[in-house]
Amino acid sequence: MITVKLYGLLRIESGIREKQLKAATVKEVLEILAAYGIPPKDLNGCVILVNGNSANKRSKLTDGDTVVLMSPVAGG
Protein backbone atom coordinates (compact mmCIF):
# COMPACT_ATOMS: atom_id res chain seq x y z
CA MET A 1 0.00 0.00 0.00
CA ILE A 2 1.02 3.58 -0.68
CA THR A 3 0.37 6.35 1.84
CA VAL A 4 -0.91 9.53 0.20
CA LYS A 5 -0.91 12.80 2.17
CA LEU A 6 -2.69 15.90 0.90
CA TYR A 7 -1.90 19.49 1.90
CA GLY A 8 -3.27 22.95 1.13
CA LEU A 9 -6.29 23.37 -1.11
CA LEU A 10 -6.17 19.70 -2.10
CA ARG A 11 -6.90 18.74 1.51
CA ILE A 12 -9.56 21.43 1.92
CA GLU A 13 -11.37 20.54 -1.33
CA SER A 14 -11.32 16.79 -0.79
CA GLY A 15 -11.57 16.51 2.98
CA ILE A 16 -8.82 13.90 2.72
CA ARG A 17 -5.80 14.28 5.00
CA GLU A 18 -4.25 10.86 4.39
CA LYS A 19 -5.29 7.83 2.34
CA GLN A 20 -3.90 4.33 1.80
CA LEU A 21 -3.98 3.33 -1.88
CA LYS A 22 -2.71 0.64 -4.21
CA ALA A 23 -0.90 2.25 -7.14
CA ALA A 24 2.20 1.57 -9.22
CA THR A 25 2.82 5.15 -10.40
CA VAL A 26 2.07 8.69 -9.29
CA LYS A 27 -0.20 8.99 -12.34
CA GLU A 28 -2.37 6.18 -10.93
CA VAL A 29 -2.55 7.98 -7.57
CA LEU A 30 -3.76 11.15 -9.30
CA GLU A 31 -6.38 9.19 -11.27
CA ILE A 32 -7.70 7.55 -8.08
CA LEU A 33 -7.87 10.91 -6.30
CA ALA A 34 -9.74 12.43 -9.26
CA ALA A 35 -12.35 9.69 -8.78
CA TYR A 36 -12.76 11.00 -5.20
CA GLY A 37 -13.83 14.33 -6.68
CA ILE A 38 -10.63 16.37 -6.68
CA PRO A 39 -10.60 18.42 -9.91
CA PRO A 40 -7.93 17.12 -12.32
CA LYS A 41 -6.77 20.72 -12.95
CA ASP A 42 -5.85 20.98 -9.26
CA LEU A 43 -4.08 17.63 -9.27
CA ASN A 44 -2.14 18.45 -12.46
CA GLY A 45 -0.69 21.61 -10.94
CA CYS A 46 0.30 20.19 -7.57
CA VAL A 47 3.77 19.69 -6.12
CA ILE A 48 4.61 15.97 -5.84
CA LEU A 49 7.02 14.36 -3.40
CA VAL A 50 7.73 10.64 -3.04
CA ASN A 51 9.50 9.74 0.18
CA GLY A 52 10.54 13.39 0.52
CA ASN A 53 12.03 13.66 -2.98
CA SER A 54 10.65 15.63 -5.92
CA ALA A 55 8.68 13.40 -8.28
CA ASN A 56 6.45 13.53 -11.36
CA LYS A 57 3.54 11.57 -12.84
CA ARG A 58 5.85 8.95 -14.33
CA SER A 59 7.51 8.18 -11.00
CA LYS A 60 7.15 4.52 -10.03
CA LEU A 61 5.94 3.55 -6.57
CA THR A 62 6.62 0.57 -4.36
CA ASP A 63 4.86 -0.79 -1.31
CA GLY A 64 5.45 1.45 1.70
CA ASP A 65 6.14 4.65 -0.25
CA THR A 66 4.69 7.96 0.93
CA VAL A 67 3.36 10.36 -1.69
CA VAL A 68 2.82 13.98 -0.64
CA LEU A 69 0.69 16.24 -2.81
CA MET A 70 0.65 19.99 -2.13
CA SER A 71 -1.14 22.85 -3.80
CA PRO A 72 1.33 25.31 -5.29
CA VAL A 73 1.77 28.47 -3.25
CA ALA A 74 1.49 31.86 -4.92
CA GLY A 75 2.06 35.27 -3.55
CA GLY A 76 3.57 38.57 -4.24
List PLM regions with ranges.
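Ubiquitin-like/PB1-type beta-grasp interaction modules and other compact soluble beta-rich domains
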Residues: 1-75
